[in-house]
Design a protein with these regions (language model features):
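Extracytoplasmic/periplasmic solute-binding protein
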Residues: 129-133, 138, 162-212, 256
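Conserved N-terminal structural module of periplasmic/extracytoplasmic solute-binding proteins
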Residues: 4-10, 22-93, 97, 105-112, ...
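Short helix-initiation/N-cap motifs at beta->coil->alpha
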Residues: 61-69, 89, 158-165, 238-252
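Bacterial N-terminal signal peptides
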Residues: 10-18
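Hinge/lid segment of periplasmic solute-binding proteins
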Residues: 87-138, 161-164, 178-179, 191
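Glycine-centered hinge/linker elements that transmit conformational signals in sensory
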Residues: 166-169, 209-241
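Short, solvent-exposed loop/beta-turn-alpha elements that line the ligand-binding surface or hinge
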Residues: 101-116, 156, 184-187, 202-222, ...
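Extracytoplasmic/periplasmic substrate-binding proteins
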Residues: 225-282
C-alpha cells in the first residue's frame, strides 16, 4: 500500500463574536480543554490587573462539544460567548458572514510577524478575523524502543502500509501495549478531521468539481475500512470514545506504540514530568 500520509494544518484561534452582548465588566471565553489552553487561562490575572473592572469567565469544553456549542451559538446569534477558540476552517467563512468582528491591533502586536499562510487563512476580503494562539500540523509520534525491538524504522515519508506494518509489529496486547492510537470519538473536532486527511491520501474527496457528494466512492470505502481495521486490530479497547486527551494519557503511560495527531502534543509526550516514556518518543 503506497498511500502517503498527508498533513492537515490546524491551529487554536482566538476570535471575537460579532453577536456577543458583553455585560459590563465581563468577558466570556469559550475554549478547548487541552494543555495549552489551560495554560492560557493562568494568564487571566495579568489581564484583569491590566484591565481593572473586567472579569474573565472561562467555559472550557472538550473539542467536539466546543465546536457544536460555538457553532450553534454564533449561527443563531445567541451571544453566549464573547471570545472563542476556533479553527482556520471556520474563521474566514464566519468572518465573511459577519459572525466575527474583524481584528485591529495597536503597535504592540506585530500583525506582519504572523506567518503568511496563517494570516491569509484567517482573513476574508482583506480583513483579519482571528489571531493565532498557535499553528500546527499533524505528525506521527512513536516509541523508538518498540520500533527498534521490532527491527523496523520510521522513514521521513511513511506510507499507510508502513504505518500498518509498524503498528502490527509493536502491538503486545498481553502487556497492554497497542501498536497505534488514533482518535475514534465521532465528530468534526475528533475523528473526522483526521479521517479526512487519511481519505485524501487514498484519493478520496468529499465532493467533485460539481459539488456532488463522493462518500460512496471506492476510495472512501477503502480509507474507512483501513481506518477501522487499523484500530480494531492494533488499537486499544474503547477507541471509539478516544479523543486527544484520552490518547495523550494512554501514550504517556506507555500504552501506545504510535500516535498520529496534532504537533501540539509534542510538548506533552516529550516532557518527563508528564510522560513515562518521554525519553523514547520520537
Amino acid at each position: 500500500m503506497k498511500k502517503n500520509i498527508k498533513i492537515l494544518a490546524g491551529s487554536a484561534i482566538l476570535a471575537v463574536a460579532s453577536s456577543a452582548a458583553v455585560q459590563a465588566g465581563e468577558l466570556t471565553v469559550a475554549t478547548v480543554n487541552n494543555g495549552h489552553m489551560i495554560t492560557m487561562q493562568s494568564l487571566t490575572g495579568h489581564f484583569e490587573k491590566d484591565n481593572p473592572g473586567i472579569k474573565v469567565n472561562w467555559v472550557t469544553l472538550d473539542e467536539g462539544t466546543l465546536r457544536q456549542r460555538v457553532t450553534t451559538d454564533i449561527a443563531t446569534k445567541g451571544g453566549q460567548f464573547d471570545v472563542m477558540t476556533i479553527g482556520m476552517y471556520e474563521a474566514p467563512m464566519w468572518g465573511a458572514k459577519g459572525w466575527l468582528h474583524s481584528l485591529e491591533f495597536g503597535s504592540s502586536y506585530d500583525v506582519d510577524d504572523l506567518l503568511p499562510a496563517m494570516r491569509n487563512g484567517l482573513s476574508a476580503n482583506g480583513n483579519l478575523y482571528a489571531a493565532p494562539f498557535y499553528g500546527e500540523s499533524s505528525m506521527i509520534m512513536y516509541r523508538k524502543d518498540l520500533l527498534d525491538a521490532a527491527g523496523m524504522s520510521m522513514p521521513d515519508n511513511p506510507t499507510w502500509g508502513h504505518v500498518q506494518d509498524a503498528a502490527a509489529a509493536m502491538t503486545d496486547k498481553a502487556n497492554g501495549v497497542y501498536g497505534i492510537c488514533l482518535r475514534g470519538k465521532p465528530g468534526w473536532g475528533d475523528n473526522m478531521a483526521f479521517l479526512t486527511t487519511m481519505a485524501n491520501s487514498f484519493g478520496a474527496r468529499w465532493f467533485d468539481e460539481e459539488w456532488k457528494p463522493q462518500l460512496d466512492s471506492p476510495a472512501w470505502n477503502h480509507a474507512v475500512n483501513f481506518y477501522v481495521d487499523l484500530l480494531t486490530h492494533y488499537g486499544p479497547p474503547g477507541s471509539s470514545g478516544n479523543s486527544f486527551n484520552e490518547i495523550l494519557a494512554l501514550i504517556n503511560e506507555g500504552k501506545c506504540g504510535m500516535w498520529i495527531d496534532a504537533t501540539i502534543a509534542a510538548s506533552f509526550v516529550s516532557d518527563p514530568s508528564q510522560s513515562k516514556v518521554a525519553d523514547v518518543i520520537a
